[in-house]
């Protein structure tokens, strides 16, 4: 399977190489019909998708998927949707979710901007998660950073009033950029107050990558804003 795209725009990601394992390939045959959602299916009805009404969490760029599966298992009273463009990560996520019988998780293999525009109803999300997005640290590539004024306004429309937009990054310059964009964005409030970074919430797992960075003295910054208007 290949990632789904619809609208032409500046991409905040690069489709990286990397072969799928046999287990990941088999996961698409076995588990995609249950866990996968197509961009081209159009707007979702979360209650129909999950068979119940529950708090809804959307994660953009779940990587290899372990932390998202962990969150879904740890919070069975909420429903989770993940978006990822890299097939090996999607294959790993659905393989683990299927093997472990995780009922409250679905995913897209598509461009997040397309999914937000075409599939996620306004005012439907209790939380949107964006953990460790590509920092595009070269200045000439800064425009590719996903956190931009237009993007955060799109997120605000998808959140419920009081819903949270939670970002995390291990690049200090990107953390400062995120804070600058969010502080200037209308209709948001920083739950930590002012321009303060938030402590890591208990629901966000610490990844192996993050622990490695911490052992090397790297920082991690959490930014959490709620929709106020």
From Swiss-Prot:
GO molecular function: tRNA (guanine(46)-N7)-methyltransferase activity
Pathway annotation: tRNA modification; N(7)-methylguanine-tRNA biosynthesis
Binding positions (S-adenosyl-L-methionine): 59, 84, 111, 134
A GO CC term attached to the entry: tRNA methyltransferase complex
UniProt-annotated stretches for the region Interaction with RNA: 140-145
SUPFAM superfamilies reported for this sequence: S-adenosyl-L-methionine-dependent methyltransferases (SSF53335)
Amino-acid positions noted as binding substrate in the UniProt annotation, renumbered to this chain: 138, 170, 207-210
Superkingdom in the source lineage: Bacteria
Active site: 134
InterPro entries: SAM-dependent_MTases_sf, tRNA_(Gua-N-7)_MeTrfase_Trmb, tRNA_methyltr_TrmB_bact
Keywords assigned: Methyltransferase, S-adenosyl-L-methionine, Transferase, tRNA processing
Catalytic activity: guanosine(46) in tRNA + S-adenosyl-L-methionine = N(7)-methylguanosine(46) in tRNA + S-adenosyl-L-homocysteine
Enzyme class, spelled out: transferase
EC assignment: 2.1.1.33
Coiled-coil stretches noted in the UniProt entry, renumbered to this chain: none
UniProt-listed Pfam families: Methyltransf_4
NCBIfam families, alphabetized: tRNA (guanosine(46)-N7)-methyltransferase TrmB (TIGR00091)
Similarity field: Belongs to the class I-like SAM-binding methyltransferase superfamily. TrmB family.
Function as written in the Swiss-Prot or TrEMBL entry: Catalyzes the formation of N(7)-methylguanine at position 46 (m7G46) in tRNA.
This protein's name: tRNA (guanine-N(7)-)-methyltransferase
Taxonomic lineage from the root: Bacteria, Pseudomonadati, Pseudomonadota, Gammaproteobacteria, Cellvibrionales
